């Protein structure tokens, strides 16, 4: 974390946001749900197709916007040096998608959901759209950077929220001066730096209620069992 802070120029960025407020723009019942599959819907594998369909089925009044290689520039403006490093394979598509989701949330607000999330109930029954921030605050089954306080695969906030603003500054500062990532969990470490140093972000993250989440990946090679599915969906 210390190395990431130094390489990202965290000291000056933290100073910029230290006394900032969260910005109380609500998530809203009609904000977009952002899902990314770079190759487009026609090239989704079966699991992603099912998850994407579940998001649309449970979206309520939220428009579901699929971000692809062909349309992402309609919604997000990225610095030329970032796009060049993606083209040169210095930034992987995985880490580019980290910046893309933060860019979308900062500029438009909304809900980011990874393409392999299966929705089993309506989005607005999972979170309160009148709040300004939501993520999956859960009891961690193992020790990691987030320790259950957040997940980067599901984040929701209103437009111009302080967290994506801080994270985007950190991402851009890092990649302006470096050609490779220092750890796969770079995104989580940036959130951790924000959580530990920006009081408004600490308060915002801590305000999210505890949520039960289920990991279906361990069941991928097992026959479908309706009872087990009901338990996962409870």
Go through each PLM region and give its residues.
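Small-residue hinge/turn detector
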Residues: 98-108
């Amino acid at each position: 974390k210390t190395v990431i802070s130094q390489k990202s120029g965290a000291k000056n960025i933290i100073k910029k946001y230290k006394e900032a407020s969260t910005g109380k723009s609500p998530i809203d019942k009609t904000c977009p749900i952002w899902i990314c599959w770079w190759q487009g819907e026609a090239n989704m594998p079966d699991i992603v197709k099912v998850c994407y369909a579940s998001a649309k089925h449970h979206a309520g009044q939220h428009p579901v916007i699929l971000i692809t290689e062909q349309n992402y520039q309609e919604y997000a403006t990225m610095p030329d040096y970032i796009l060049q490093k993606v083209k040169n394979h210095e930034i992987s598509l995985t880490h580019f998608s980290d910046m893309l989701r933060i860019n979308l949330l900062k500029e438009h607000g909304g809900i980011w959901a990874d393409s392999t999330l299966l929705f089993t109930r309506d989005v607005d029954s999972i979170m309160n759209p009148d709040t300004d921030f939501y993520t999956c605050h859960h009891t961690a089954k193992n020790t990691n950077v987030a320790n259950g306080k957040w997940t980067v695969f599901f984040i929701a906030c209103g437009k111009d929220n302080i967290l994506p603003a801080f994270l985007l500054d950190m991402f851009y500062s890092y990649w302006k001066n470096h050609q490779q990532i220092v750890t796969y969990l770079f995104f989580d470490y940036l959130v951790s730096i924000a959580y530990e140093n920006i009081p408004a972000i600490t308060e915002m993250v801590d305000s999210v209620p505890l949520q039960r989440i289920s990991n279906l990946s361990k069941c991928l090679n097992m026959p479908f069992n309706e009872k087990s599915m009901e338990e996962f969906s409870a």
